[in-house]
C-alpha cells in the first residue's frame, strides 16, 4: 500500500465561511486544500440577492492568503419572497452558481428560510429555465417529527415531488445522512446529486452520545445510527458520480458549542481531505477518492475539473486543540486526536 496519494485538486461543494473578522481564518483553511467552494448564504442577514452575493464574494476574496487563487462560488438564500427576476439576475451575475433551500428553522440562521416549498415554485421554475442548481437542506422541521426521522420524512413529503415537478432542474441533496437519502439519489434521474460530509462517513450517533455528550460532534442533520453510516460509505466509495464532496464545515466559537444549548456544526475545513482519506482507506477505496473529491462535483455543475494536484502522505500528526476564530477560538473536529494522513505542503 502506497504511503503517498496524489489527486487532482479537489473542490468543496458545501462550506460555511461565516463573515467579518473570522474570514481570514476560515478562508485560509479552505484555500489550503480546495480550489473552489460552494459558499453557504446563511449569514445574518442572509445573502438574498446578486448584489449581496457580490459584496460577500469580495469580502471572501479580500481574505484569501497571499498568492491564493481560491474561487468562491456564491449561492442565494431562498425565501418565501424571492422572485424569478432575482434568480435571473443572480444567474446573469456570473458568480452565483446555485440557490439554497433552507426549510425555516432547520439549522443555523435558517429563520428566514422557506415556510412552504410551494411558495418558491415560481423561483424554482426560473432556476430550471436558466440552469441554476437547487441546493436542499432536506429535513422537515415540524416539532412533532423526531430529529432522527426528519430527513426521511423530507424525502417522502417534498423531495420526490420537487424532482418530479421540475424534471430538468439540477438538485443537490446536501449533506445526506441516511440510507434512505442514498437510495433516493441513486435511483433518481441524473440531474439529482448529493454531497456527503467527512463526519457522516467517519462517525455515527454513538460517537456523539455514548460515554458522555460530545458537543463538537453535533451537527444538522444529526449523526444517525451505524447502518446509515455504512450506507453513506457505500455510496461515497461506489464511484457513482452522483455523490461528491461537501464538507459542511461550519465553525462556531468554543463558547457557542460547549454550552447548555450548543450550536450545530462541525469544523473540518482545516483537515477535510485528510479525514475523507481515512474514511476511504477504511473501505480500501482510496482509488475512488479522486472521483468523489475532484471529478464528480465539477461534472455535476458543468465546470472543468482542476488541473493542478495535491499530495497526501501517510504520516500521523496531532490535530490542534483549538484554532483562531476572530477574537475567539474554534474547537475543530478531531481536536487533539491523531490523523493518519497529512497534506503535503507545496514547499515541503
Swiss-Prot record:
Cofactor details (free text): Binds 2 Zn(2+) ions per subunit.
Gene encoding the protein: pyrC
One Pfam family it belongs to: Amidohydro_1
PANTHER family documented for this protein: DIHYDROOROTASE
Name the record gives this protein: Dihydroorotase
Organism: Pseudomonas putida (strain ATCC 700007 / DSM 6899 / JCM 31910 / BCRC 17059 / LMG 24140 / F1)
Superkingdom of origin: Bacteria
Keywords: Hydrolase, Metal-binding, Pyrimidine biosynthesis, Zinc
Pathway involvement of the protein, from the record: Pyrimidine metabolism; UMP biosynthesis via de novo pathway; (S)-dihydroorotate from bicarbonate: step 3/3
Record field: catalytic activity: (S)-dihydroorotate + H2O = N-carbamoyl-L-aspartate + H(+)
The protein's role, per its UniProt record: Catalyzes the reversible cyclization of carbamoyl aspartate to dihydroorotate.
Classification via CDD domains: DHOase
Amino acid at each position: 500500500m502506497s504511503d503517498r496519494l496524489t489527486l487532482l485538486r479537489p473542490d468543496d461543494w458545501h462550506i460555511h465561511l461565516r463573515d467579518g473578522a473570522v474570514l481570514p481564518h476560515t478562508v485560509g483553511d479552505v484555500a489550503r486544500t480546495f480550489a473552489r467552494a460552494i459558499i453557504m448564504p446563511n449569514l445574518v442577514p442572509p445573502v438574498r440577492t446578486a448584489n449581496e452575493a457580490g459584496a460577500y464574494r469580495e469580502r471572501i476574496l479580500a481574505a484569501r492568503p497571499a498568492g491564493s487563487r481560491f474561487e468562491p462560488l456564491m449561492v442565494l438564500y431562498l425565501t418565501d419572497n424571492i422572485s424569478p427576476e432575482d434568480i435571473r439576475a443572480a444567474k446573469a451575475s456570473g458568480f452565483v452558481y446555485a440557490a439554497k433551500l433552507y426549510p425555516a428553522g432547520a439549522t443555523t440562521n435558517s429563520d428566514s428560510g422557506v415556510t412552504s416549498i410551494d411558495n418558491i415554485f415560481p423561483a424554482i421554475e426560473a432556476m430550471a429555465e436558466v440552469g441554476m442548481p437547487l441546493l436542499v437542506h432536506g429535513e422537515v422541521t415540524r416539532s412533532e417529527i423526531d430529529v432522527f426521522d426528519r430527513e426521511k420524512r423530507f424525502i417522502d413529503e417534498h423531495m420526490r415531488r420537487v424532482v418530479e415537478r421540475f424534471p430538468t432542474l439540477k438538485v443537490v441533496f446536501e449533506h445526506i445522512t441516511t440510507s434512505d437519502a442514498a437510495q433516493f439519489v441513486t435511483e433518481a434521474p441524473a440531474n439529482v446529486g448529493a454531497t456527503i460530509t467527512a463526519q457522516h462517513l467517519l462517525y455515527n450517533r454513538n460517537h456523539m452520545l455514548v460515554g458522555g455528550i460530545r458537543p463538537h460532534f453535533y451537527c444538522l442533520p444529526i449523526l444517525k445510527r451505524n447502518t446509515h453510516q455504512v450506507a453513506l460509505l457505500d455510496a461515497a466509495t461506489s464511484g457513482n458520480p452522483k455523490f461528491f464532496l461537501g464538507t459542511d464545515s461550519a465553525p462556531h466559537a468554543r463558547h457557542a458549542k460547549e454550552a447548555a444549548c450548543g450550536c450545530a456544526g462541525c469544523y473540518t475545513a482545516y483537515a477535510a481531505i485528510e479525514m475523507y482519506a481515512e474514511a476511504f482507506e477504511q473501505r480500501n477505496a482510496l482509488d475512488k477518492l479522486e472521483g468523489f473529491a475532484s471529478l464528480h462535483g465539477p461534472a455535476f455543475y458543468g465546470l472543468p475539473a482542476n488541473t493542478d494536484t495535491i499530495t497526501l502522505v501517510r504520516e500521523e500528526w496531532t490535530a490542534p486543540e483549538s484554532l483562531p476564530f476572530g477574537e475567539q477560538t474554534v474547537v475543530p473536529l478531531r481536536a487533539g486526536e491523531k490523523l493518519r494522513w497529512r497534506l503535503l505542503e507545496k514547499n515541503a
